[in-house]
Design a protein with these regions (language model features):
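Proline-centered helix-kink/hinge sites
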Residues: 9, 42-43, 50, 119, ...
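Structural microenvironment flanking redox-active thiols in thiol-disulfide oxidoreductases
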Residues: 46-137, 144-151
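Short, P/G- and charge-enriched loop/turn segments at secondary-structure junctions
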Residues: 1, 106-108, 174-178
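Active-site acidic short loop of glycosyltransferases
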Residues: 28-30, 61, 182, 191
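Thiol-/selenol-based redox modules, centered on thioredoxin-like
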Residues: 140-218
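Flexible, glycine-rich phosphate/dinucleotide-binding loops
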Residues: 42, 75, 127-129, 197, ...
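Short active-site neighborhood of thiol/selenol oxidoreductases, capturing the structured segment around
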Residues: 22-53, 65-69
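N-terminal "domain-start" segment that seeds a small globular fold
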Residues: 1-25, 157, 161-164
Length: 218
């Protein structure tokens, strides 16, 4: 797992859907903002991507590169290549994204009223077949429950059992999502012009504009 202020690891990409094929190590000298999203993720389209569109408009004359990374850690029947193609080609959305954005009046004929204007890649989603479920569970708990050791024994057992059940039902994993140990979508990665990971966040509304300004000042 790359830590903040350490070298960023290249994205493990299945396919570039929009824009030229590239990667972090190919773009040294340029700062990069990567918005990680899922097709079936309403918050990605009510907050995550609109936030990046605002950043793009504000910093259009800067050297900042902006990429989208479509990943999948759930709902694999919706978060897939076919639905990403629909999104890229026509703005068509599906699943909970369709339901929520329709209810908010944000769609036109089940489509976004804008096109995504930056390169988008598909995370490499592969079958999940760990050799050691116990080790996987311990790593999962360490990532998502940093105060685990301070919990009562009863709570520790409950969490451990739930995590193990989840992992044994898990069929696929998204390589970049797992490598960066992201907690959900939308998430954001900021990488400086020397290829150093300078920020990693889950969610929106955490002052991304100021973080980008700091990145560009390095």
């Amino acid at each position: 797992m790359p830590l903040v202020d350490s070298p960023a690891i290249d994205l493990d990409i299945k396919e570039w859907m929009l824009g030229p094929s590239t990667n972090i190590s190919n773009e040294l000298g340029k700062p990069i903002l990567i918005k990680v999203f899922q097709v079936n993720c309403p918050g990605c389209f009510t907050h995550g991507i609109p936030e990046v569109l605002e950043i793009r408009a504000k910093f259009i004359d800067s050297p900042l590169l902006i990429w989208g990374l479509a990943t999948a850690f759930e709902d694999f029947h919706l978060n897939n290549l076919d639905n990403l193609k629909k999104l890229i080609d026509s703005g068509e959305v599906v699943g909970e994204t369709l339901a929520v954005l329709s209810a908010k009046g944000l769609l036109n004929n089940n489509r976004l009223d804008y096109s995504i204007p930056f390169p988008v890649a598909l995370d490499n989603v592969v079958p999940y077949n760990p050799s050691d479920y116990l080790s996987e569970a311990q790593n999962f708990i360490k990532k998502d429950f940093p105060q685990f050791d301070s919990f009562p024994v009863k709570n520790q057992k409950l969490i451990s059992d739930q995590v193990m059940t989840y992992l044994k039902q898990k069929k696929f994993e998204a390589k970049t999502f797992e490598t960066y140990q992201l907690k959900g979508t939308p998430s954001t990665l900021l990488i400086d012009n020397k290829g150093i990971l300078r920020g990693k966040w889950f969610g929106s509304d955490y002052g991304l504009e100021k973080e980008v300004e700091k990145l560009l000042s390095l």
